[in-house]
Amino acid sequence: GYAENMAKAAAKNLPLFLSSTMLYRRETQYIKQQVAEFGKPVHYIYHIGQYLPDWHPWENYKNFFVGNARTGGVREIFGIDLPWLLDTFGDVTHVTVQEDSISDLGLPYPDCVTLLLRHASGAQGVLAADVVSPKAVRNFECFGDGLHLFWEGNPKALYEFKDGDKRFVNTYASFEHDSRYSDNIVENAYVDE
């Protein structure tokens, strides 16, 4: 468990941290750079979801960590995505939470959670995470007076609206993808991490 891993890391004088794969995605790095260069408060809307039985179709979702209330699928999504959001928009100063269960998955935790986040930078965001979306989705939109970014979660779908045009932003010369997973899972970030 956690205590055992922490003890092993301490014995070897190694840091122990949650996966921060999204910090290594070139799309999130680009978004962070653009927000920093913009220099004014922005708002964002971010929806991440995927039907839980499709996460690992080769095994029953109730038999691995996402079926457990303590380590469930929605918590996993937050654990993956909050690090890059905090890195990009700053610490959260206020949060409002709405939870719901709208599926027949029989989970011991809410299958849909929506957060309204206020960041120290002045940014405000809506973060919706779910384990019921029939299609795996990672849709992000960030906007301010003079900035508008769109990202559909994969390397072929990052855009910025500039001078009246929606323009593709190419952040990868090439990328690795395992066909067993959704198109928003890119192996490059795992290697970089």
Where are these regions (language model features)?
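Rossmann-fold NAD(P)-binding glycine/threonine-rich loop
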Residues: 2-15
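C-terminal glycine/acidic-rich active-site capping loop/insertion
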Residues: 145-193
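Short aromatic-enriched loop/helix-cap "lid" or pocket-rim segments at secondary-structure transitions
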Residues: 28-30, 53-60, 107-110, 138-140, ...
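Predominantly a Rossmann-like dinucleotide-binding segment in NAD(P)-dependent oxidoreductases
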Residues: 22-98, 103-106
